[in-house]
Design a protein with these regions (language model features):
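A ligand-binding cleft/hinge motif common to bilobed small-molecule-binding domains
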Residues: 97-101, 224, 229-248
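A short alpha-helix/helix-coil micro-patch that ends at or immediately precedes a cysteine
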Residues: 53-61
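Mature extracytoplasmic/periplasmic domains
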Residues: 259, 263-326
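Immediate post-signal peptide segment of exported/extracytoplasmic ligand-binding proteins
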Residues: 22-40, 58-59, 163-169
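Extracytoplasmic ligand-binding site segments that recognize negatively charged/polar headgroups
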Residues: 40-54, 66-82, 86-227
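Conserved C-terminal helix/tail region of periplasmic/extracytoplasmic solute-binding proteins
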Residues: 320-357
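Short, low-complexity disordered leader/linker segments with a strong preference
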Residues: 1-36, 352-357
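Periplasmic-binding protein-like
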Residues: 137, 201-206, 212-213, 245-271
Length: 357
């Protein structure tokens, strides 16, 4: 009787998923995942979206789903320390530079996902199946217009403007020790300026930085209240703050050009619940998962063909394709070295602002 009930439940779930628009998932995978019974998700997207996705996955498949919100740098440090015996099963959200470093270190498991066929482009997946993209975010500036007016300052329009002495102590960005966003910023400047000029740039920029935040979204959360006057980060985080009531925030795409993140999901090598992890990847690549972001006030551009883009983003006029031709291979191969070079360039300026707990 129990066996019959389990088979009926699997069949019902497959039928339900097909009705929702999810691609047909192997019944054997669903059954194996349910037998494992649990899944542990480390999420580097914003927590409301992470919580919504974990809850929905649990409701769909009857698999107890635990989650913890950590920055990409924190996840990377954790799985590096665990060295093939991870306490988590999957990674969800956050920019791909730390994913690539982790894959290179043998800490991610390759998996060929069926639902990857619905990705808008092959650029939104790792060629070997170590990670898959779920959203895209544009890098830029968020500024407090009231504070700039009070100080008698114009808003910066490009990367080089951030070096002006009048912005000393007004700029926040994230910490390369803990945030994938900061690694993307470093890679972006290397690709725009060349390696040596980029390192010189960061030495000058550091003179104007008041704080390096643990999370990439950290600056955006302090712009509206004026604690941060100029924040470097993803513009969708700024949109979330504007829509929450901070109409004193303006969004700026740097005039010299900018890059973008691909927010990803992946399986940890050596995870305990491997089948549940594979099922999560299939789920994460569905419109039913990625469209939860809109209701959770995460306004990234979605990279799933059949997914509906968040309507709240349209009035801001952001073009997801108005970005540089970001060299993902260079970032994949050299991010670790570039971060080391960043700290070496700063020298004694790499002070307590970069400390991690």
């Amino acid at each position: 009787m129990k066996k019959l009930f389990a088979l009926l439940l699997c069949a019902l779930l497959v039928f339900s998923c097909a009705g929702l628009g999810l691609a047909e998932i192997d019944e054997a995978l669903i059954k194996a995942a349910q037998e494992e019974g649990e899944l542990v998700v480390y999420g580097s997207c914003e927590e409301p979206y992470l919580a919504a996705a974990a809850k929905h996955f649990e409701e769909l498949y009857g698999i107890k789903t635990y989650y913890q919100r950590l920055s990409t740098g924190e996840v990377q440090a954790k799985i590096t320390e665990e060295n093939g015996n991870p306490s988590g099963d999957v990674w969800f959200g956050g920019t791909t530079d730390p994913y690539n470093e982790s894959a290179k270190a043998g800490l991610l498991m390759a998996y060929e996902a069926k639902n990857a066929a619905d990705l808008a482009s092959d650029m939104y997946r790792d060629a070997d199946g170590y990670w898959y993209g779920i959203y895209k975010g544009i890098l830029g500036f968020m500024v407090n217009t009231e504070e700039l007016e009070r100080l008698g300052l114009e808003a910066p329009q490009g990367w080089d403007d951030l070096l002006k002495p009048e912005y000393q102590g007004l700029i926040w960005m994230s910490n390369p020790n803990t945030a994938g966003t900061a690694k993307l910023i470093i890679n972006t400047m290397v690709q725009l300026k060349g390696h040596d000029e980029a390192m010189k740039y960061f030495v000058e920029l550091d003179k104007n930085i008041a704080q390096y935040t643990k999370s990439g979204s950290g600056p955006s959360k302090k712009v509206g209240i004026g604690e941060c006057v100029i924040g470097i980060g993803f513009l969708h985080d700024g949109i979330a703050q504007i829509l929450s009531g901070y109409d004193n925030i303006a969004l700026i795409i740097p005039s010299e050009g900018t890059s973008f993140e691909i927010g990803a999901t992946a399986i940890f090598e050596g995870c305990v619940h491997e089948n549940a992890a594979k099922l999560w990847i299939e789920y994460a690549l569905s419109p039913e998962c990625v469209e939860l972001a809109d209701d959770a006030e995460s306004y990234q551009f979605l990279v799933i063909n059949s997914a509906q883009q968040p309507a709240a983003v349209e009035p801001f006029g952001l073009d997801p394709n108005n970005v540089i031709d970001y060299d993902f291979e260079d970032a994949k191969n050299n991010t670790t070295q570039y971060v080391t070079d960043f700290f070496n360039a700063l020298g004694d300026a790499a002070d307590s602002r970069f400390k991690t707990e």
